Design a protein with these regions (language model features):
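Short, well-ordered coil/turn segments that N-cap beta-strands
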Residues: 13-17, 64-67, 97-99, 135-138
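Glycine-rich, proline-tolerant flexible connector loops at the mouths of alpha/beta enzymes
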Residues: 47, 71-83
């Protein structure tokens, strides 16, 4: 069972932490962005490749001391299909290192995450000096915050 694997990882690392992977392009070191933009241009693909490279470095540094990662889907969806592929590749890489992967895909999240979903599905995203419209929806359905014990 899935949770049994997580418990095993927690026991092995003696650490109940989860590393959140909420990679805003602004957080990615310049040398990674420059390398990816040189190869793929200031494109959604270039941005997504930069996120993936950054994540790989984090995973390499953490996999033997932290049992799990939690990539936030919104920050990948901001870069369209290339970003969704980077999410998949991040998950695949974390699993290859033996980590437990929790996809954070809640659509009724905090402000910064909602801004990322809005940019991905309704707005525009800046990559270097270029601006892109990752997905072409005219509207996006979301769940409102649900408060109370029944919703925890």
């Amino acid at each position: 069972m899935s949770l049994d694997r997580l418990i095993e990882k927690i026991e092995k690392t003696q650490n109940p932490s989860v590393a959140g992977l909420d990679p805003k392009l602004a957080y990615v070191p310049e040398y990674i962005k420059e390398k990816c933009f040189e190869k793929y241009g200031e494109t959604l693909k270039g941005a997504a490749k930069a996120l993936l490279e950054f994540n790989k470095g984090l995973i390499d540094a953490l996999y033997d001391i932290v049992p799990a990662v939690k990539p936030q889907a919104a920050y990948y969806e901001m870069y369209g299909p290339a970003g969704v592929k980077a999410l998949y590749k991040t998950q695949e890489y974390a699993r290859s290192k033996g980590m437990y992967v929790i996809t954070d895909g809640k659509r009724n999240d905090i402000g910064t995450t909602m801004e990322a979903y809005a940019a991905a599905h309704l707005g525009k995203v800046q990559v270097g000096s270029q601006t892109y419209e990752p997905f072409l929806g005219d509207a996006l359905t979301v769940n409102g915050y649900q408060i109370g014990r029944a919703h925890v």
